[in-house]
Amino acid sequence: MRIEIKLLPLQDNPVIPFNYNYELYSQIVEKAGAIEPRIVKLLESPHGYWTFSRIIIRKREIIPEKGIKILSDDISLYISSSNKEIIKGIVEGIEKSPEFKIGDVGFLVADIKALKSKEIKNVNIFSTLSPIVVRTVKFEGDKLKHWDLYPHDELFLDRLRKVMLLRYHEVMGDLPEDKDFRIELIKFKPTRLIVKDSYIRGSLMVFRYYGSKEIAKFGYENGFGEKTNLGFGMVKIIEEQ
């Protein structure tokens, strides 16, 4: 299930920071938890029971070293999960407390609407609404460190497959019948964001997906890759001409 939240800035000439994922995540979890405390554990789970998009600003100006100046009347945030109780808790929490703060800018929720589900096929074109994060671990000296992977890295697809199967099993309770898929990269842009106190590198991508419909549907609903609950891995479907 997927929703769109319209937000109205409460200040003139609003400028939001480039790094806002953790602020949004914390406020969404707090609002939903105030209504339905039992879903907080799911919202905080690293297995990614849900995902959300970057803030969609249809008219904007990038101000280097400062942030994004909002030139449109409103902005949009998309949230998705295969778990209807999660979406219900988020919606009810936001309706009860319809204010958000991003950086120094306050926002008021103007509208929340459910979006129609798209048909998932064996071949789909996906475009990211937030960067896809795929990581591995490597030794540097005597220390084990996380290493972020991009689509051109040899380990990217293998690691993405493993992550999606692990998350599918944890969230859905079993494994998909068809476990195999591959992707064909169409467009790619690397990103680096600060989440809490850590740098996370991800991939904004347009890609053609081939294979398991179950994993495709799971990724569409809950996000592709890792850290989806922190606002990574959300995709939309592009209709092929």
Curated annotation (Swiss-Prot):
Entry similarity comment: Belongs to the CRISPR-associated protein Cas6/Cse3/CasE family.
Pfam families reported for this sequence: Cas6_I-A (PF21350), Cas_Cas6_C (PF01881)
Signal peptide: none
Cross-referenced InterPro entries: Cas_Cas6_C, CRISPR-assoc_prot_Cas6, CRISPR-assoc_prot_Cas6_N_sf
GO function term, MF aspect, one: RNA binding
Protein's job: CRISPR (clustered regularly interspaced short palindromic repeat), is an adaptive immune system that provides protection against mobile genetic elements (viruses, transposable elements and conjugative plasmids). CRISPR clusters contain sequences complementary to antecedent mobile elements and target invading nucleic acids. CRISPR clusters are transcribed and processed into CRISPR RNA (crRNA), also called psiRNA (prokaryotic silencing) in this organism (Potential).
Protein's UniProt keywords contain RNA-binding: yes
The keyword RNA-binding appears for this protein: yes
Record-given protein name: Putative CRISPR-associated endoribonuclease-like protein Cas6
Keyword terms: Antiviral defense, RNA-binding
Gene name, Swiss-Prot/TrEMBL: cas6b
Subunit structure: Binds crRNA.
